[in-house]
Amino acid sequence: MAYENIILEKEEKLAVLYINRPKAMNALNKDTLLEIKDAVTAVNDDPAVELLIITGSGDKSFVAGADIAFMQNLSAMEAREFGALGQKVFRLIEAMEKPVIAAVNGFALGGGCELAMCCDFRIAASNAKFGQPEVGLGITPGFGGTQRLPRLVGPGMAKQLLYTADVINADEAFRIGLVNKVVQPEELLPEVKKIAGRILSKGQLAVRLSKAAANEGMQTDIDRAMSIEADAFGLCFATQDQKEGMTAFLEKRKANFISK
């Protein structure tokens, strides 16, 4: 698929997906969502890539939201279908086997905040802005904001942000737990790639099983969640990576993981 609204770059075991609609502040329309879906599927299916970073082109906007010009004249049925598409694409990102990090540069509003939230975690530039401003447009969030925001920052803070349409800066996003770290804009991608490097130096089968256990466990009761973790723990002991990791530890050397 030829991309017009995104850029997908690969650097050894790492892929970087840029939302690339600078004239529209990287806003999301239907075509952009379909391109993201294609790229994410390709990354997940590529055995050479083990981690994905999602960011926005330029330094002003991660994703400014869903494209209001595109949405303005949608019928109720068309709007529901557009929301369902966004939910499906973001759920695909969330459910990827491989780790996904959001490198948030500039505005992450509405659909942009929702895109960041479906990633495993978020690192923000100091100029980043977050919010779900939809009620100010007479609509609700449509790409998962009412569901993921309470899970990340708690229901009280989430409802305040949802009801007021307040936009918060990167430091406040860090304070409430929406982002893991705030860095200067010029340090954003280098810092995220540094974190990615630390992840990639570990056993990737174990990383993926850890992600799956965490994601699945949050959707069920604690007893079922513990069983999911036990299954993941047991599976690790059928891998070459477990044998290599423990042998390397005992021999006081760096492990050479092969994802098998």
Curated annotation (Swiss-Prot):
EC number: 4.2.1.150
Keyword set includes Transport: no
Subcellular location: Cytoplasm
Reaction(s) catalysed by this chain's protein: 3-hydroxybutanoyl-CoA = (2E)-butenoyl-CoA + H2O; a short-chain (3S)-3-hydroxyacyl-CoA = a short-chain (2E)-enoyl-CoA + H2O
Pfam families: ECH_1
Induction of its expression: Highly expressed during syntrophic growth with butyrate (at protein level). Seems to be constitutively expressed.
Record-given protein name: Crotonyl-CoA hydratase
Organism field: Syntrophomonas wolfei subsp. wolfei (strain DSM 2245B / Goettingen)
